C-alpha cells in the first residue's frame, strides 16, 4: 500500500506519495483550483451530466453520495427502448438493440471491473434491501450454537431492519443474536481491529459478519479483506452492503474471498432514483447448486427456462439469484452510467478522487469560525470521496445557508453535513466555491 504523508507549510498543504519525489501543494485560491482543473484528464466527463439549476445557473453539486446526477445519454437510451418496444412488441426480447431476454448480461462485465469480480459473480437486479434479504436467506443459516451476526453499530437503518427481521424469522432474539461493534470511548470511528477481535472472541457462535463497506454517516471505509479473513477463520460467512463503496472505491471482492455483497446504483453509479441494485456472489458459492437460494424463472438455467418444466435448476453464478426478468426501463440509466465508468476507469477515478477529496479536506481545515469537525478518517485509504462535518451547533443553519447559495450537500441526523466531491463530475473549482461560500457563513 502506498504511504501518504500530509504536511502543512505556511499557507500551503502538501499531499505526498511514495510514487512522487515532489509534494503537490494545495492552495486556497481560485487560480490554483482552476489550474488543477485544466490538468485534469477526466474533466470532460463533467460535460456528460445534467446539473440542477439555481437562479439560472448550475448548482454546485456535492450530493452524489445520496443521488448521483443524470447522465445526458439517459434520455437517448430511454427513447431507444421505447422505440424498440413500439417497433418490435414482444419480439423486442430478442430483436431490440439490447435484447431484453439477455438484458442483464450487458451489465455484468462492466460491474465486475468496478467491484473486482469475475463477470459471472455479479448481476444487476432488484434493489438493495431486497437483495440483502435474498442473500441472507442463502448465507444466514443459523444452526445450534452458530447463530450470531456481527455488524457495525450505526449501520444504515435499512440494514439494521433487515438483519433484525432475519434474526426474528429464525426464532432468535436480536438483543442476543446481533453483536454490534461500537467506536471506542470518545471516538467517532470503529477500528477495524475491534471488529476483527470481536469476531475472534465470538468464535464459532458467529454465523455471519455483515458490515457496510463504507459507513453512510462517517464515510469510513472498512478493511474488507481482513474482516473477511477473520470471519472465515471462525467458520462464518462475510457479506457487505456496498451502497457507499461501489463506484466510489476500487475493490477486489473476488480476491478478498468475500462471500456476498449487494449495493444500490443511484448514488455513485448515477442510475436514477430507485435504480436497480446489484449483487456479488463468489464463484465458489455461485457454482454450487446445493447452496440454497430462492428460485425464480430468471435464475433458472437459460436453456430450459422456456420449457416450463418442474424443478428449479439454477444457472451458474450470481445470476441464479435472479427471480424475474430485468426491469429494462429501470435499468436504462444504469446502462448509460456504466458506459461512463468503463471509459473513465475506476482506478483513474480513484486517483482523482484522492486528490479532490484531499483538497476539500484542506479547504475545510482553513475554516476556523464554524464549530465543526471532520469525522471521516484522515487517512485517504480509509475513506472514499465523502467528508462528514459534525457540527457542535448551528449545523442546520449552515446547511440551509449552503442551499440558499446554490450548493447541494446532504444533511444527516444527528448534526452532520455530508459532502462528496465525485470525480466523474466535480471539480477543484467546485471545492473552492464550497470553501468560499462556507467562509462567508456566520
Q: Which residue stretches match the model-derived regions?
A:
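Pyridoxal 5′-phosphate
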Residues: 15, 19-442
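Basic polycationic patches enriched in arginine
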Residues: 2-4
Amino acid at each position: 500500500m502506498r504511504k501518504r504523508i500530509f504536511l502543512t507549510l505556511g499557507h500551503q498543504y502538501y499531499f505526498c506519495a511514495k510514487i512522487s519525489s515532489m509534494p503537490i501543494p494545495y492552495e486556497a485560491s481560485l487560480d490554483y483550483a482552476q489550474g488543477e482543473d485544466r490538468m485534469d484528464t477526466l474533466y470532460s466527463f463533467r460535460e456528460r451530466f445534467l446539473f440542477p439549476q439555481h437562479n439560472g445557473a448550475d448548482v454546485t453539486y456535492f450530493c452524489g453520495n445520496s443521488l448521483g446526477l443524470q447522465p445526458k445519454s439517459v434520455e437517448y437510451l430511454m427513447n431507444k427502448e421505447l422505440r424498440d418496444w413500439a417497433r418490435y412488441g414482444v419480439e423486442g426480447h430478442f430483436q431490440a438493440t439490447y435484447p431484453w431476454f439477455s438484458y442483464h448480461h450487458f451489465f455484468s462485465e462492466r460491474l465486475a471491473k468496478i467491484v473486482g469480480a469475475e463477470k459471472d459473480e455479479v448481476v444487476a437486479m432488484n434493489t438493495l434491501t431486497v437483495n440483502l434479504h435474498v442473500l441472507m436467506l442463502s448465507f444466514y443459516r443459523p444452526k445450534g450454537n452458530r447463530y450470531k451476526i456481527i455488524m457495525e453499530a450505526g449501520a444504515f437503518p435499512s440494514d439494521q431492519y433487515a438483519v433484525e427481521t432475519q434474526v426474528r424469522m429464525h426464532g432468535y432474539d436480536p438483543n442476543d443474536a446481533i453483536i454490534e461493534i461500537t467506536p471506542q470511548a470518545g471516538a467517532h470511528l470503529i477500528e477495524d481491529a475491534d471488529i476483527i477481535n470481536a469476531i475472534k472472541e465470538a468464535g464459532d457462535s458467529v454465523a455471519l459478519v455483515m458490515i457496510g463497506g463504507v459507513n453512510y454517516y462517517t464515510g469510513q471505509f472498512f478493511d474488507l479483506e481482513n474482516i473477511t479473513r477473520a470471519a472465515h477463520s471462525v467458520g462464518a460467512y462475510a457479506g457487505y452492503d456496498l451502497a457507499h463503496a461501489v463506484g466510489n472505491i476500487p475493490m477486489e471482492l473476488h480476491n478478498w474471498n468475500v462471500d456476498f455483497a449487494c449495493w444500490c446504483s443511484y448514488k455513485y453509479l448515477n442510475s436514477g432514483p430507485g435504480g436497480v441494485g446489484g449483487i456479488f456472489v463468489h464463484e465458489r458459492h455461485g457454482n454450487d447448486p446445493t447452496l440454497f437460494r430462492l428460485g425464480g424463472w430468471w435464475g433458472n438455467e437459460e436453456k430450459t427456462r422456456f420449457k416450463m418444466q418442474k424443478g428449479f435448476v439454477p444457472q451458474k453464478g450470481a445470476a441464479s439469484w435472479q427471480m424475474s426478468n430485468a426491469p429494462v426501463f429501470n435499468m436504462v440509466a444504469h446502462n448509460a452510467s456504466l458506459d461512463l465508468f468503463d471509459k473513465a476507469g475506476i482506478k483513474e477515478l480513484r486517483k482523482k478522487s484522492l486528490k479532490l477529496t484531499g483538497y476539500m479536506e484542506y479547504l475545510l481545515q482553513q475554516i476556523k469560525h464554524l464549530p465543526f469537525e471532520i469525522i471521516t478518517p484522515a487517512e485517504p485509504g480509509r475513506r472514499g470521496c465523502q467528508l462528514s462535518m459534525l457540527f457542535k451547533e448551528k449545523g442546520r443553519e449552515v446547511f440551509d445557508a449552503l442551499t440558499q447559495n446554490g450548493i447541494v450537500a446532504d444533511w444527516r441526523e444527528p448534526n452532520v453535513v455530508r459532502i462528496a466531491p465525485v470525480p466523474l463530475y466535480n471539480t477543484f473549482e467546485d471545492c473552492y466555491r464550497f470553501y468560499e461560500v462556507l467562509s462567508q457563513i456566520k
